[in-house]
Amino acid sequence: MSESQLSLTPVKRSFQFGQHQVTLETGGVARQADGAVLVDMADTVVLVTVVGRKDPAAARDFLPLTVNYQERTYAAGRIPGGFFKREGRPSEKETLTCRLIDRPIRPLFPEGFRQEVQVIATVLSLNDEVDADIPAMIGTSAALALSGIPFEGPIGACRVGHLDGEFVLNPTFSQTAESDLDLVVAGTQDAVLMVESEANLLPESTMLDAVLYGHEQMQVAIDTINDLAAEAGKPRWDWQPPAKNESLDSAVAELVRSDLEAAYQIADKQERSERVGALRDKAVEALADEEREGWGAGDVGEAFKTLEKKIVRGRILAGHPRIDGRDNQTVRPLNVQAGVLPRTHGSAIFTRGETQAIVVSTLGTGRDAQVIDALEGERREPFMLHYNFPPYCVGETGFIGTPKRREIGHGKLAKRGVEAVMPSDEEFPYVIRVVSEVTESNGSSSMATVCGTSLSLMDAGVPLKAQVAGIAMGLIKEGDEFAVLTDILGDEDHLGDMDFKVAGSKDGVTALQMDIKIDGITREIMEQALDQARSGRLHILEQMNQVIDKPREQMSEYAPRLLTMRIDPERIRDVIGKGGATIRGLTEETGTNIDISDEGVVTIASADKAAAEEAKKRIELLTADVEVGKVYDGKVAKLMDFGAFVNILPGRDGLVHISQISNNRVENVADELSEGDSVRVKVLEVDRQGRIRLSMKAVEEE
C-alpha cells in the first residue's frame, strides 16, 4: 500500500430485526464528529452524527439539545423540483421524525447537564418499502453511545403493526397500509420511554400488548449497540453533575414554602401563575447574592423550581386535592358548542376547564388536495388538519410566523385521533381541511383539538363512523407510590413523570401518544392509565353527543355540492378537448369546477345543484356512444354537394346523404337545408372507422 492511501477500518455489527437485516457501521465516515454511525436497514441507509460542545455551559436552565433529520432526494434517485433544484425547508415528515428522535433521548441526559448537543440524521439511500425513521432512531442511540457524551442509554426503537390478529415487527409501507395499527415505541433495556401510534379502533388491551411486544423486540438493537460501543466507543466525558446546594434549598423553603403551598391551591391559572411568579421574584431578590453566598439568580430559580415540584407532587401522593381542587379521576368542566360560525362549512368550540379550541372544517374538491412530494413518491392528501397555538392562548406575547415543530406535531397527533373514523373517498369525495385555533391553553390542547375536530366535522355533514374524543393522563411516582391523573393541567404535565394522551371512540382507541421521563413504569401503571383514560373519554363523549351525536343531514349552504359520475377512460380526451378548450368552456358556462381522475371518475363541484346537473348532462352527451337506430335532434353543421353533415352529439357529426334527405327526389342540397337548421335524424350505421350514416327520410317514414 502506498503512503498516499488512507486506511479506514470501520467497525460493523449486524442483527436481524423482523424481516430486515440491520447493519451498524462506525469509524469510516464523519470521523470528526463525537459519534457517527451508518445504519443500513434493507437498503435504507441513514448517517447519524452527534457532536457535543465541551466548553463551559452558559447560564441556562435547560438542555440545549437539537435534533435535525433531513431527507435527501438523491436517496430515492430523484432531483428536487423548484427553481433552485435543492432541498428546501423541512417537510412535515422530517419535522415529525425530528420529534420522534428527540422525545426518547431527551430524558436520558443526566440532570444538570447543560452542554450543547446536536444530532443530525441524513437519509442517504431509501428502499421505498422501509421507512427511514426507525434506522434514524437506532442510529441516534448508537452515535450517542459511541460519543462519550453523558447519556443514560442506549435506547432501542421499532415499529409494530397488527395484521390478521398478529403483531408484525417493522412492517413495510405496504403492510402498514393494510395494518390496523401503526405504532412506534422506543425505550431502554428496562423501560418504555415513548410511544407514538394510530389505530383502527383497537381495544386498550391490544394497544398495551403492542407497546410491550415492541419493547421486548427492540432488545436486540440495544444489545448490538452496547456491543459496538464496547469496541469502538470513546471515553466518557469527565463531567460531574452540579452539587446539590442544600443550604440554598433550605433557605428558599424557609422563605416561601407556606406561601407557595397556598399559591398552588389557587384554581385559576392566571392568578396562580402571577402569585407563583411574585414568590419566585421575592426569593431571587432576597437570596441571590453572588459575593456573599455565591448564589446567583439562576441558582435560586433552580431551588425554587425544586420546591415547586416537591409541593405539587407531595400533595397529590398524600391524597390531597389537585391544584384546581379535583380528585385524580375527574375531568374538568366541559362546554361544547357546534355550528358557531355562520359562513363556514362546519365549526365547533370545545372548552375543557381553561383549555379551549375553535375548530373549523372546510370542504373542497379534488383540486384542493395537498400534493405531498415525499421521498418514497408523490401522493395526494385529501384530509388536512392544522393546529395553531398563538401566544395569547397562554396570556403571552410572541412571534407569529410559520408553524413550529410543536404545532406540526400536535396537529399530526389530532389527525391520527380522527383518521380511523373518516369516510373513504368513495363514501365522501370531498377534500377536507380542519383548522384548530387554540384560544386558551392549560394542558392538553391537542386532545381538545381531537374533540373539536369530531364536532366540527359532524357539523359540516361529514359522515364520520363514530364520534371521537381525546384525553391526557399524567403520573406522579415516588418509589412504589404512584398516582395516575386524569385530564392533566399544564403544571401537572410540567411537574409530572408521564404525559399519556389517548384518543378514541366508545368502541376503541384511535391514537396513543406517551412520553415518560422516569424508569419503573410497570404494566400495572399503564393499565390503570388506559382504564382511567377510557372512563374520562366516555364521559367527554357523552357530553359531546348531547350537542351533536351524528353528522348533519344538510350541509352548509356555502359548501360546494359534489356530483360524481364515471366515464370510459378512453373518452376523457373528449371531455377535456384540444388544449383543454372543451372542459374550460364547460366550467365557464356552467360555473362549476370539474375534476377528472385517470380512472374516469368525474367530480363536479358547485354551490348550485342545478348548475352541477347541467354540467353532468353535458358530459354525458360528450361521452355518449352513438346508437344505431336511435333518433337524434341535430343541427346542420355543413352542406356538401353530396349531402349534409349534422351534429348529433357534442363533437360527433354524421352524414345525411342527399338520397336520405327526403322521400322526394332532391337535386340540390341547399334547396332543402341551410347551415344551422335543426333536424331530426336516425342513425343508420356506424362503420369500423367511426363514421356515422344518418337519415332524415327514415324519420319521415316512421
Curated annotation (Swiss-Prot):
Annotated localization: Cytoplasm
Cofactor: Mg(2+)
Enzyme Commission designation: 2.7.7.8
Chief location of this protein within or outside the cell: cytoplasm
Catalytic activity: RNA(n+1) + phosphate = RNA(n) + a ribonucleoside 5'-diphosphate
Domain named KH: residues: 560-619
Assigned GO CC terms: cytosol
Gene Ontology molecular functions: 3'-5'-RNA exonuclease activity; magnesium ion binding; polyribonucleotide nucleotidyltransferase activity; RNA binding
CDD domains from the UniProt entry: KH-I_PNPase, RNase_PH_PNPase_1, RNase_PH_PNPase_2, S1_PNPase
Major enzyme class: transferase
Occurrences of domain S1 motif (ranges): 629-697
GO biological process annotation, one example: RNA processing
Family: Belongs to the polyribonucleotide nucleotidyltransferase family.
HAMAP family: PNPase
Cited function: Involved in mRNA degradation. Catalyzes the phosphorolysis of single-stranded polyribonucleotides processively in the 3'- to 5'-direction.
Protein name: Polyribonucleotide nucleotidyltransferase
